[in-house]
Amino acid sequence: MKLKNIISTSLSFLTLFVVAQEKQESNNSFSFSVTASDMKVVTPVFDEPVLPINEDGKTYFVRNKMRRNKFTNSENALPKGGDPLLNHQKSSHPNKAPIVNWDGLNSSQSGGATPPDPSGAVGPNHYVQMVNSVYQIFDKSGNALTNPATLGSLLGGGNAGDPIVMYDKFADRWFLSQFSHQNQLIVAVSQTPDPTGAYNLYTFGLSSFPDYPKYSVWSDGYYVTANKSGDNAFVMERDKMLAGDPTAQIIGFTIPSLSTGGFFSVLPATASSTLPAVGTPNYLFYFQDDAWA
């Protein structure tokens, strides 16, 4: 995949600034590039047993050794004392009441693990919820259209978790993903606007474990970041994945000038109202504070 975009990285201190790399003219400018190791068409299965409910009713904390956290605070961090930007006044705007409200997947249905890693997306007619290793599809009135189903029943790769669901409104398609413990990102893109129908399923192998993946929709691809060192930002060929093309690629690069407190995950910008013009760079956001980095 040949991208000629300017890769821009935005990092937040107390103010926001943008760091732009030179225009990339070929794949050789990126540290990682690979074609999907597997592509197939799959149909969701909603009549298989879900994860067993915890007999003791307890919630379990899932420890992830891949997540690197340093709980250190710098004595030289500014400002000293209170935050001068802290707002002490209540908003004058009244809160809006929910349009509709219903119970989704609960802890027992989703395996009882903590954190639950919830993700949800809404489309014109559906709401898709993912929690831990389970997902379920509802209509927009809150009626369950399917039984809860394991991620593995659709995505394969076991039920590793860290699920993400997006509705790509520009293509009227659904995007569901989880990682696998084989250093893979597994992505399903629906073939129609119906999330209960068939999906194009892609498996992308990476150089190391893609912890805490975060995705976005952009004009030239699906962008994704991961909590890992080395190549930690990627772009998937969106057009090919929507078409079910088995030659779809993912390219990756290392985010430059990133000082972290041990947590590498960055948030990619996603298009909301309209798709940016072709050639518009994507922006990656990272909150950086001198108290820890």
Show which residues each predicted segment covers.
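C-terminal PAP-associated
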Residues: 22-293
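Bacterial Sec-dependent N-terminal signal peptides
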Residues: 1-25
